[in-house]
Amino acid sequence: LTHEYKDAPEMRQLMREYQDQLRDIGLNGLGLLPPIPHSSGHKFVGTETCGKCHKTAFEIWEGTPHAHATASIVSPPEDPGYVARHFDPECISCHVTGWNPQEYYPYASGYLSLEQSGHLTGNGCENCHGPGAEHSAAEEEGSNISEEARIALRNAMKLPLEKAREKCMTCHDLDNSPDFHEPD
């Protein structure tokens, strides 16, 4: 249903019970794949790390719904009766950093919980650009990496425009974002 229809209290209660079960079972108990390495072989560091160098991009991101994606499933301010969904893999996969959004499993070093990996809240830079641990380490003063390797890591983080739509659609699909329209 659309947002024009109010949730029935009985359905909210069922959803609350379901979310409580997900919390109690935990990700391991759900039979999900164990966290697997990202196809790049790199690890996630979180958007704050990206923002140390990419200050303007970070400031813009902070003002977007992507920055508040996790908060929106924990407790959206406009709905005090909302049922938190931050234990639900189908929600987590697009509302945090470091999950496969189509197959609902975390990558190794990806988000696991607010307590364990709070630095990976929000739909961060790395969901589209790839895990940034090696790139950010290479950019640190005193790193022992060659300039050629540093440039290769930079290039690997670039998201060509033609690939951006594909990345967007992994979360903004018809099931989750039927009203999503690409900017002109």
Residue spans of the language-model regions?
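Non-transmembrane alpha-helical segments in soluble domains
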Residues: E126, C168-M169
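Sequence context of c-type cytochrome heme-c attachment sites
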Residues: K6-K163, F180-D184
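Domain-level detector of nuclease and nuclease-like folds
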Residues: L161-E166, D173-N176
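Acidic, metal/ion-coordinating pockets
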Residues: L1-E4
